[in-house]
Amino acid sequence: MNHFLDIHLTDPADLREIIDQAAIMKSARKGRPRGAPDDTQPLKDRIVALIFEKPSTRTRVSFDVGVRQMGGQTMVLSGADMQLGHGETIADTARVLSRYVDLIMIRTFDEAVLTEMAEFATVPVINGLTDRTHPCQIMADILTFEEHRGPIAGKKVVWSGDGNNVCASFLHAAGQFGFDLTFTGPQTLDPDAEFVELARSKGVNVAVERDPAKAVEGADLVVTDTWVSMHDAQSARERRHNQLRPYRVDAALMSRAKPEALFMHCLPAHRDDEATSEVMDGPQSVIFDEAENRLHAQKAIMRWCLAV
């Protein structure tokens, strides 16, 4: 049994196995209807609980479709259904769910909820997102980069904007996959120093550059994310916009990267805030391949967790 809680907690050889498996499974589905089953049915007779304390479009749909394609069934539970930690303890919830289902995916706010769920569950637990990390997204991003440009090892990735949970998982991935990462953004939104040092301890170059034009020079991949939550108050949105406007990814900024550089954004996006529509819809953008690859990467993660 394998939990998938964070990239830095997973052996590099296992991460490579997941990426390679995802690529094989994606290739095998070419030309098939979305609802057609995979040739192999590794999740036949398996039930996967999908827990959403924090709502999502991509995570819910991609996991649900992936389970169905592999022959399994899903049980979707919202925060209102569960009330995690506000009645029954998380530990007891984990123990009970483990008697009903074969795998648990949880998308939550507090990483401590994820950690406790994994500690007491007797089935694998997958981190669908926390406020601290988002490893499934980065596995999809690496799959996307490698299908367009080959191995990511030794490449330069630039993160522009807020050093948030997706940025944190990119830092973890840098150490495990062997690519360099430059963060460019305001000092008040720097990524967690603990994550920076962890990546550096693996021998990769992690740099902080306040000037975005300098940061993206020679980049193989430029990545950003939404500046504000879709649910943030207007005052918070205005404050973040003032801080982050210099770090918007536009055509002028992308021109400083390598000509073959790719652009990624995990979506949803506030178009023309963190990135211009010109870039998002341009030839260097792979944002919709990236979104599709959530499906394939997560299918491979589930197979790895269950060893099927």
UniProtKB/Swiss-Prot annotation:
Keywords: Amino-acid biosynthesis, Arginine biosynthesis, Cytoplasm, Transferase. It comes from the Bacteria. GO terms for cellular component: cytoplasm. Pathway: Amino-acid biosynthesis; L-arginine biosynthesis; L-arginine from L-ornithine and carbamoyl phosphate: step 1/3. One of its GO terms (molecular function) is ornithine carbamoyltransferase activity. L-ornithine binds at residues 165, 225, 229-230. Signal peptide: none annotated. The keyword Amino-acid biosynthesis applies. Its EC number is 2.1.3.3. Carbamoyl phosphate binds at residues 56-59, 83, 107, 134-137, 266-267, 294. It catalyses: carbamoyl phosphate + L-ornithine = L-citrulline + phosphate + H(+). It is found in: Cytoplasm. GO terms for biological process: arginine biosynthetic process via ornithine; citrulline biosynthetic process; L-arginine biosynthetic process. It holds the Pfam family OTCace. PANTHER family: ORNITHINE CARBAMOYLTRANSFERASE, MITOCHONDRIAL, ORNITHINE TRANSCARBAMYLASE, MITOCHONDRIAL. Belongs to the aspartate/ornithine carbamoyltransferase superfamily. OTCase family. HAMAP family: OTCase. Reversibly catalyzes the transfer of the carbamoyl group from carbamoyl phosphate (CP) to the N(epsilon) atom of ornithine (ORN) to produce L-citrulline. This is Ornithine carbamoyltransferase. It comes from Roseobacter denitrificans (strain ATCC 33942 / OCh 114). The lineage of its organism: Bacteria, Pseudomonadati, Pseudomonadota, Alphaproteobacteria, Rhodobacterales. The gene is argF.
